[in-house]
């Protein structure tokens, strides 16, 4: 009488496991850079959306008072920057009394940009030898104020 032995153990061989790990590694190598790219792109888009909301508040301030933040005449492309748009001197959320006809607040609060920095208003922002009034973010590297570089996100409000 012959005895037959059956091995009912099932599982993956070492080669099969290594191939599965290699496939997971390749997929991760493709997915992670794309994830980082879209995360960065999403932050830039969020910043642009917030800048457009600030622009609407800025326009309402200009319509009511004839002024931009820092009590500059609306449309004027000269003057000092405003680094904190939440301050009463900016006139968007509260007034320090220097905005006749103020009927705000024009925005509940000015958020920080997606990288944790304040948005700014610059009514003498220079691009290619032309002056603009602009609102902006210092972008992912957060370098500023008065240090404008390529990663800044700028929304032009008015030009000279």
Q: How should each PLM-predicted stretch be described?
A:
Residues 12-22:
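N-terminal signal-anchor/signal peptide hydrophobic helix marking the start
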Residues 21, 48, 55:
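Conserved catalytic core of two-component sensor histidine kinases
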Residues 24-42:
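C-terminal juxtamembrane segment of a hydrophobic transmembrane alpha-helix
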Residues 59, 114-160:
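Short, surface-exposed interaction loops/tails
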């Amino acid at each position: 009488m012959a005895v037959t032995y059956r091995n009912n153990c099932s599982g993956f061989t070492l080669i099969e496991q290594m191939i599965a790990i290699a496939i997971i590694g390749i997929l991760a190598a493709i997915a992670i850079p794309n994830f980082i790219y879209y995360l960065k792109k999403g932050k830039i888009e969020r910043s642009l959306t917030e800048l457009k909301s600030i622009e609407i508040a800025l326009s309402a301030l200009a319509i009511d008072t004839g002024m931009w933040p820092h009590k500059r005449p609306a449309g004027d492309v000269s003057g000092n920057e405003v680094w904190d748009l939440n301050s009463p001197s900016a006139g968007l959320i509260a007034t320090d009394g220097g905005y006749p006809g103020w009927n705000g607040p024009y925005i509940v609060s000015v958020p920080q940009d997606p990288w944790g920095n304040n948005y700014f208003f610059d009514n003498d922002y220079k691009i290619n030898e032309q002056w603009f009034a602009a609102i902006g973010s210092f972008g992912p590297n957060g370098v500023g104020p008065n240090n404008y570089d390529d990663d800044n996100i700028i929304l032009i409000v008015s030009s000279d």
